[in-house]
Amino acid sequence: MQPITTASTQATQKDKSSEKKDNYIIKGLFWDPACVIA
């Protein structure tokens, strides 16, 4: 699994809207941004 920092960085670069999805990652759900967006 990729570290949360890397996932958050990639998500931010892809879309600012993904910041909301980062909240789920911060909660403890280690989901990849791509999976969440999909």
Curated annotation (Swiss-Prot):
Key words of the record: Cell membrane, Lipoprotein, Membrane, Methylation, Pheromone, Prenylation
Bilayer topology term: Lipid-anchor
Chief location of this protein within or outside the cell: membrane
Residue numbers carrying Cysteine methyl ester: C35
Location relative to the cell: Cell membrane
Region (Disordered): 1-20
Chain intervals with Polar residues compositional bias: 1-12
GO biological process, one term: pheromone-dependent signal transduction involved in conjugation with cellular fusion
Molecular functions per Gene Ontology: mating pheromone activity
Propeptide: 1-23, 36-38
UniProt cross-references to InterPro entries, sorted A to Z: Mfa1/2
Lipid anchor positions (S-farnesyl cysteine): C35
Example of a GO cellular component annotation carried by this entry: plasma membrane
UniProt superkingdom: Eukaryota
Family matches, as Pfam families: MFA1_2
Purpose: The active factor is excreted into the culture medium by haploid cells of the A mating type and acts on cells of the opposite mating type (type alpha). It mediates the conjugation process between the two types by inhibiting the initiation of DNA synthesis in type alpha cells and synchronizing them with type A.
Protein name (database record): Mating hormone A-factor 2
Taxonomic path: Eukaryota, Fungi, Dikarya, Ascomycota, Saccharomycotina
Gene name of this polypeptide: MFA2
